[in-house]
Amino acid sequence: MPSRLPAFRLLLVQLVVVLVAAISLWISWGPVAGYSGLLGGMIAWLPNCYFAYKAFRFSGARAAREIVRSFYAGEAGKLILTAVLFALAFAGVKPLMAPALFGVYLLTLMVSWCAPLLMGKTFTRP
């Protein structure tokens, strides 16, 4: 479980960012912007949850083959799930504010790019 903790911590940080961004959009631009932003964040966050589940199911040297297979399956599933969620959002949600959707989507992805740089960093003097 300790090796899985950073992934789940990152997912929690992403979820908090999604919720704060959606609430901020709701307050400043109205309900359409708010739920559009929430959809964009969920389109990024849910596939990341799927990937984390698939990627960290196995551990240990004996499961090396399963780990690699699981990573590839997780990434493929993440891409497919992202495409399906975008299609569902644009086909099924009217009205939709695309800039809010894409903005929070990108913000959520940026959290996953930047958070590993800050997580677990210890500053010690030489």
Curated annotation (Swiss-Prot):
One GO term of the biological process aspect: proton transmembrane transport
Cell membrane as UniProt keyword: yes
NCBIfam families reported in the protein's UniProt record: PRK05760.1
Location relative to the cell: Cell inner membrane
Function description: A possible function for this protein is to guide the assembly of the membrane sector of the ATPase enzyme complex.
Transmembrane segments: 10-30, 32-52, 71-93, 98-120
Record protein name field: ATP synthase protein I
GO CC annotations on file: plasma membrane; proton-transporting ATP synthase complex
Membrane topology value: Multi-pass membrane protein
Domain of life according to the entry: Bacteria
Gene of this entry: atpI
Keywords: Cell inner membrane, Cell membrane, CF(0), Hydrogen ion transport, Ion transport, Membrane, Transmembrane, Transmembrane helix, Transport
The organism of origin for this protein: Pseudomonas aeruginosa (strain ATCC 15692 / DSM 22644 / CIP 104116 / JCM 14847 / LMG 12228 / 1C / PRS 101 / PAO1)
